[in-house]
Amino acid sequence: MEYCLAAAALNGVDRRSLQRSARLGREVLERAKRRAVDWHSPERSRGNVGVLYRQGPYQERWSVPGSQRLLGEREERCPTLSSSFGAMAEFMDYTSSQCGKYYLSMPEEGGATHVYRYHRRKPPEMHMYSDTGHSQEQRNCRGETSVGQESIYQTSEHSQESSWPTENISKDLYIEVYPGTYSVTVGSSALSKKTHVVAVDPGQSVDLVFPV
């Protein structure tokens, strides 16, 4: 302390100001030592905010409402990889729903385009009729892009109704993906599914034809 005072005197700092700064610093340190957040407190405070109470003449604690219950639930549920990804999927689904609601409220055409492009969940159905007109077959035509265990489904923009035979009906799908290798599967049943593996480079456009 004396060394600091001597150095301060040489630098033109007032001795009284330096002592006052040291005293204030010690007071702040003592107050910080007396305060702590008690997450395991057996007492539960009322209301929605933490309550400051004194345990002793020189100690103060913050009681967080419901903290013991939350910690107990976390300890009971052992975190696993599946539960972690499940929680992430729930948050992403909620975020997506809120995003869709926001863009649905926009009067501009861009809002409807955004919702159609990113927030559609059910693929449109394509109705096809036989030549006799007595039987009706409904098929869900969807393009499936799979990477590992994850799949991204893209649907066509408009459903088509026609009395032509099945082999004369065509459907175009446009899918935007990041560069990489993808397995593309198309089909409405396990027997009719057809798969192509394609490698996409940056800026490359790949055309795939599936006879369905």
Swiss-Prot record:
Disulfide bonds: none annotated. It is found in: Nucleus. GO terms for biological process: regulation of non-canonical NF-kappaB signal transduction; substrate adhesion-dependent cell spreading. It comes from the Eukaryota. The keyword Nucleus applies. Keywords: Nucleus. Its main location: nucleus. One of its GO terms (cellular component) is nucleoplasm. Interacts with PRKACA and RELA. This is A-kinase-interacting protein 1. The gene is Akip1.
